[in-house]
Amino acid sequence: MLRIAICDDEKLFRENIKKYVLKYLSEKDISSEIDMFNSGKELLGLGTDLLGYNIIFLDINMDEIDGIMTAHKIREYSMDIYIVFVTAYVNYSLEGYKVDATRYLLKNTINFDESIYECMD
C-alpha cells in the first residue's frame, strides 16, 4: 500500500491532485492511503510519523513555512520519501534540486493530469 501526503494551501488544488492520483492508482489496482494538509506547518507537525509516507506532493508558495523549507525539514527525517513539488511558479524549479525532489509539476498546465500520471509511473 502506498501512503501519500498532499500539502497545498489551496483546497481546490489538494482535491485535484487527490482526484488524479486516485484515478491513476485505481487504473493500476494499487491500494493507497492519502492524507491532505493545508500547510507545511501542519505536515511537519507529524514529526517522525512523516516516515510512513512514500510520496509527498508539496506546494511551494505557502504561508508560514513554504514548500522549500518544508522539504528541507522532511529531508532531515528521510532521503527515501519521494517529494513532488506542485506549484504555479517555474522560477523555483532549481530549488527543488537542493532537496532531491523527484519531480516539479506546474499546476496551471493543460495536461496536469498527464503530468501526475507520468510522475506516478
Regions found by a protein language model. Give the residues of each.
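Non-catalytic signal-transmission and effector/linker regions of two-component phosphorelay proteins
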Residues: M1-R3
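Conserved acidic carboxylate
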Residues: D8
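Two-component/phosphorelay signaling modules centered on CheY-like receiver
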Residues: K11-D35
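Acidic, metal-coordinating helix/loop segments flanking the phosphotransfer/catalytic sites
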Residues: K18, M36-I55
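A generic secondary-structure signal
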Residues: Y20-Y24, L46, K73
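CheY-like receiver
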Residues: Y53-D121
